[in-house]
Amino acid sequence: MQVTLTQIPTREILHFLGWHGTPVEPGLKETIKRFQEKALRKIEPRVVVREFELSPDGTLAHTRFLPLGKDVPAMLSDCRSAVLLAATLGAESERMLLREQSRSAADALILDAVLSAAVEAVCDEQEERLRGEFAERSLFLTDRFSPGYGDMPIAQSRKSAKF
């Protein structure tokens, strides 16, 4: 499903750049703003959301997908279902980043932070939408979790994308 992103939070961009509350230089502010505007014009955010019942063994029902590690199974232990959310900004975001990498490593780093903040914003919006839908069913969402967080291997990304 295509979604519309109207803003990319500057604070989140600064977080991805390792900012810890110190004053932000005017040149950096300008570069961030330029990349925010460019990204909002060029990206094509899309999401896929699927809800799966959980089998007693912790796998997603009717699949062989079992989240590895201890964190996710513990988080889902009292749950009846799990929601998989996949988000992308589209191929143009990757092309933008590749072009910027050939011009300036510093600017490419800033653009990468802008794009990372953009995909987080897309996921945040979807999470809010899902919270509302689940509340109507008297259900609640756990925290969002992704391969690479906690003890869930990043390699699970490829497996979860199949669903």
Predicted regions and their residues:
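Active-site helix-to-loop segments that bind/position phosphate- or nucleotide-bearing substrates
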Residues: M1-D107, L111
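Flexible, glycine/charged-enriched surface loops at secondary-structure junctions
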Residues: P45-L54, L130-S146
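Short, surface-exposed, charged/polar-biased interaction segments
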Residues: E53-P56, L60, A106, A135, ...
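Short terminal or interdomain "cap/linker" segment that borders an active site or interface and mediates
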Residues: L89, R137-F163
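Compact, glycine/acidic-enriched structural inserts
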Residues: A106-E128
